[in-house]
């Protein structure tokens, strides 16, 4: 009898151990960091970035890191030159464990626009993707104009204004299709749509391009962009109507491609005369199925360059 009781107790103990172990594995595999948690990880990253010291970052052994499309080692690149972050605009997506920030960084005496994307798996950073748009390498760069995040991106939409994740991505992709095909007819632009590139408003702005989002497409302003590739839509936020992606524009630099550009070809900066590509990170605000605002950080790269991903 005593032996039977001992056997029963052993069986129960073993069963409980197995249940706890299995539950532990199951629970750990379902850990999902909240938006607040992901932004905290980004803040920790940026804090160490300006200290030029990656020690203390919770990174995975197989971490992948790129800067402006090129693979780099942890602690190199912007990690060696960043001194201060003067502007931050976040977006997080707990469903994919990713967070990004558009920001302005001070390097020595110069300011630069930048984007950092982190992917976090449980408690480890597995991906770090950075784009740094310094003034001598970028178009429309005016980091000094960015002081506070635009409130439009933080606004939570009503249920009737929202679109599902797949629709948000489809709408954002239609924007790139419209550029390739030189038409705004396929792109659902909001009548009040505006675009900001490296801190500069590039729509409805007489000092850059005076026409609006749809008008620029219909006027074939971007006919010098012949291909948009490596399209990756990485984060989405249905509540706020946000979608974020990274793409590459190809620009062969041929004179005939600038026929409809508002500035005469011979008056354009010399960078327009040569083949180049553009690595872009873009965030879209989509309300009622229409693109209301676009925010981008972009940098010139060699023609045909990849994003590194």
Segments (PLM) and residue ranges:
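Bacterial N-terminal signal peptides that target proteins for export
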Residues: 1-12
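Bacterial N-terminal signal peptides
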Residues: 10-21
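C-terminal and inter-domain tail/linker signature
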Residues: 23-309
